Regions:
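A short SAM/SAH-binding and catalytic strip from SAM-dependent methyltransferases
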Residues: 121-133
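Conserved catalytic loop of SAM-dependent methyltransferase domains
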Residues: 200-237
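Conserved acidic residues
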Residues: 51, 121, 148
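Short catalytic/ligand-binding loop motif for oxyanion handling, primarily in non-cytosolic enzymes
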Residues: 62-65, 85, 132, 158-162, ...
């Protein structure tokens, strides 16, 4: 396996990325709907229709619980490079098709090899693009397999070109480095338009300084507010009444605080933990 993807095989990864499994359904919905990518999904996909959704980067599979609650007719497939994460997803939802895939595999060929005969209507990929060695090519693969739409969440910058070298733009995680690539927004738009010239592109930017957080080792300009870094939701719609349009909105993501009873239970658990650790 490429050294940039070894981190995802650490057993702790499945534990760290399974936090939503402990949320009840109300708080799970609140958590997901705080993000702009899920907002786009709800705005553009009819809840009453049956549709195929492929999630690329499904981790431990909790998104299926949200989808079943909000889109009861969804037909879902989840893919991830992490064997521990997929093992956890299968343990929780054995009836759901979850698959381990290779990071450098061709997505179209992978789906064919897995026996997926129908092209997914929607491809969804949350916080995966920035961890790719070749993020633009990865984006192209998502576009190619979707029949109707791609919805994703990535990292962007308004000022300065994309730094594609993962040695210069990376993140320390579970004892090793992984890519953390921040795409220039205009480069991103132009790449998508070249692939889907008649498509509609919608972007929701949540501006924030990306440098200096979560073990990231990034180019110096990404530590400055004026660079305009953001966590950005991207909707690419192949079937649309607004072909060829690009709409960019500044849309701060919400803080998911949880219901009052959930917050109370969390406070009690934290207090008990402190008491147990006291001498």
């Amino acid at each position: 396996m490429d050294r940039w993807y070894r981190n995802w095989q650490h057993p702790a990864h499945a534990v760290q990325f399974d936090g939503r499994a402990h949320l009840d359904l109300r708080n799970l919905i609140r958590n997901y709907e705080a993000f702009n990518d899920v907002r786009l999904l709800n705005e553009r996909v009819e809840r009453s229709r049956a549709f195929e959704l492929l999630e690329v980067g499904c981790a431990t599979g909790e998104f299926i619980r949200y989808l079943r609650a909000k889109f009861p007719l969804v037909h879902y497939i989840g893919l991830d490079v992490s064997e521990p994460a997929i093992a956890r997803a299968k343990a929780k939802y054995p009836e759901v098709p979850f698959f381990v895939v290779q990071a450098d595999s061709n997505l179209t060929e992978t789906l064919r090899d897995l026996g997926v005969t129908r092209q997914p209507d929607t491809v969804y990929s949350k916080d995966v693009v920035q961890h790719q060695v070749r993020p633009f090519e990865f984006l192209s693969s998502l576009i190619e397999v979707a029949s109707e739409a791609v919805i994703l969440r990535c990292r962007t910058r308004d000022v300065g070109t994309t730094v594609l070298d993962p040695e210069r733009s990376c993140q320390f995680y579970e004892g090793d480095w992984l890519p953390y690539i921040v795409l220039n927004l205009q480069e991103l738009v132009e790449w998508v338009r070249a692939k889907v010239p008649e498509g509609e592109i919608v972007l929701y930017r949540h501006h924030m300084v990306l440098g200096g957080q979560h073990g990231r080792f990034l180019p110096k300009e990404l530590y400055r507010k004026e660079t305009g870094t953001a966590e950005t939701a991207v909707g690419i719609f192949k079937q649309t009444e607004r072909p060829g349009t690009v709409m960019i909105y500044d849309q701060p993501e919400q803080n998911s605080t949880g219901t009052w009873d959930y917050r109370m239970r969390s406070a009690v658990r934290k207090a008990m933990k402190v008491l147990r650790s006291s001498p």
